[in-house]
Amino acid sequence: MVPFFLLFISLICIFEFRSKIGCISEIQRKTSFPLVFHSICTIFAVMNLFKRYFVWLSRIHKCRGFGIQSPTDYSFVRYVINERWPYYAYEQLDGDNWLTSKLGRLYFRLANWRQPSMMIQDEYQRYWQAGCIETNFVPIINKVELARVLVEDYDGWEALLSKCDQKSVIVVEGIWRDWERWHKLEADENTGVTFDLYYCGIVFFDKNRFKQNYIINF
């Protein structure tokens, strides 16, 4: 099974590389940028593509919540994190790069599931708002229902933590950039169930649920 997927991924990367190479001559004809610049950009794009498929392949056995014993956690993975339903709002939210779109759609589903009454304003607001049109976006909140923070933002995390209760959910974005920091958040006595999606982590604070750290293929 693994060799097949490796071959499949390699073929996709080769196809992507050839497609981008085919565009270089057209770009070169229309612009004054050196060919070498576009070649370097193409190489990096293909490398990023390969990395995405490698991450996906390394977590393939963590897909769709299989093996999760808790019905609540399984349902969250299956019907929120990896929900495949083609929401009508997705078409209206298109236009961003692949990672912004991938995370944005997840945030849409989180807002749709959590239905927060109030959230902090951020660059993903249109995704949150599409998921829950009743949400009010403000600069400061008194209680966390659903929030997002970058893994590097230590002060932001502490500020949110002081406003959390058992129903709070925090998305920690970019955990792949600082695994040490993410593992500390997983082990923190203030946190409960956590979900590692590689591109972001989701933290619950419900102490009535058994503390568990899940790695999910997202």
Residues covered by each model-derived region:
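Structural detector of well-ordered beta-strand residues that form the stable sheet scaffold
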Residues: 169-171
